[in-house]
Amino acid sequence: MMRVARRQISCSSVQLALAALLLAGCATVDPYTLPPMSQNLQREDNVGYCARLFADIDRRIDLLGMRDAETHRVAGFPYLRVDRFSAALSPRVATAAQQHAWHSRLRQLDETARAAELTNAALNVDDLPRCRELLGAADAAAAHELRAAAKVPDDYSIGMRTLGLYPLTRLPFAAGIARWHEDTRAVFAMPIDAIPVRGMLHRYSPSGSLREAAPALTVDALGVPVSSAAEQAALLARHAPVLEIDVAGAFDRLGALELDADDRASVDTGAPVAYARIAYTLLGGMVHRQLVYTFWFSERPPASGSTFDLLAGKLDGVIWRVTVDAAGEALVYDSIHACGCYHLFFPTEKVVARSLPATLDESLFSPQALPNLLPNERVVLRIESGTHYLQRVLTAADKGSSIDTVYDLKAERTLTMLARPGGGTRSAYGEDGLIAGSERSERWFFWPMGIESAGQMRQWGRHATAFVGRRHFDDPLLFDAYFELRR
């Protein structure tokens, strides 16, 4: 009897411990409970009013489920937000000018996120910009605490990895990744004409003519390139790729994301679009711009002849990124799918891959290098039908927008404020940064690797790109770990 009781107590204790571990992995700190914001809330002056205004707005945003997941509110400073690039800049802050530039970046991140949240929640609060400035001035003496708090949690769950016996289960995953590497190398080694075609090859070309992009001639106090909206648009237009897609069905056609009557994201293939943004990375001691293009498809259909495909599901996205130098010329290309999967690197002659130690963790995988682009050339991406896997990256003379189908460039942040059929707006992404309805069956088998809902389409800033190890697509230190500039 005593043994049974002890066994029951032991099992209950284990269950409680595991539950606590999962909860701990999901727990987030209320940014209003820490100083200086917790102290500001107690004040009876304008600072106190502003602190309570932000708290009230955030409470309403959370109740309505409109929180934007791209960036993170800073604990103790919830009128500011941080992303991985801003967090990586923190150690550079040494002077008053650098502190001002860094604080301005965090302030701008909050302004951008709140613009979407307030629009989607149909809230109009005129005092927020003034209050953000006032709170920033009131908290100026807490600059050291701000830098310590401006951190971004990674997108891996310790609890899931612990429950999934990650040290053991990662072994078959690592073997599977090695097989994928072999298969991918084999495809990239094929003569281009030998790559199988299921349907018909169709090219999507960016709108507008090829233009030389003016280099960013100035940087801010932190070394971040400063360029006008027109210069950014020219740079994005210059490096926008041509897509050569094996089209075997509607699921292989590019389109614009829109919301249906149930607020679920779908793809309008009558409006081909690339969603673009500019990001930043650190390489060779300098900050470099990154041009990011996201292309959406309506689905990844089940493999031909398959009755059950773990990887199939609604929506599929391909992300293409170009890291450029100060003159606006490509250094490295890389790509993932919008789930964070299939991370491939395509270095140019301007960089050299570092010698990395052998490890089980996913690391630099480059099935192909690329030459430097000539002034009249564009990159062409060959994409497989159904899976939308990259099969080859080519360079070819630009033919303008006179071939096949033209796609437009649109700001990627517009996806956080899509029009609803019944009026108003809503983000394509949930508060968890995932697109509802794009779940994959693989999530039931891949969870021991610690990634929430593996295979599901997700928002910028939420792409974990390694099942084995830890890696994020927007990690600004990633390229410096993998490459060095050729001398």
Positions of PLM-derived features:
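Bacterial N-terminal signal peptides that target proteins for export
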Residues: 2-16
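Intrinsically disordered/low-complexity terminal segments and short unstructured peptides
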Residues: 8-12, 27, 322
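C-terminal motif of bacterial Sec signal peptides marking the signal peptidase cleavage site
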Residues: 23-25
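Domain-length functional cores that host ligand/cofactor binding and catalytic or interaction surfaces
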Residues: 29-211, 312-316, 326-487
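Extended, regular secondary-structure scaffolds
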Residues: 163-265, 304
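Short N-terminal edge-element motif at the start of the domain
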Residues: 250-333
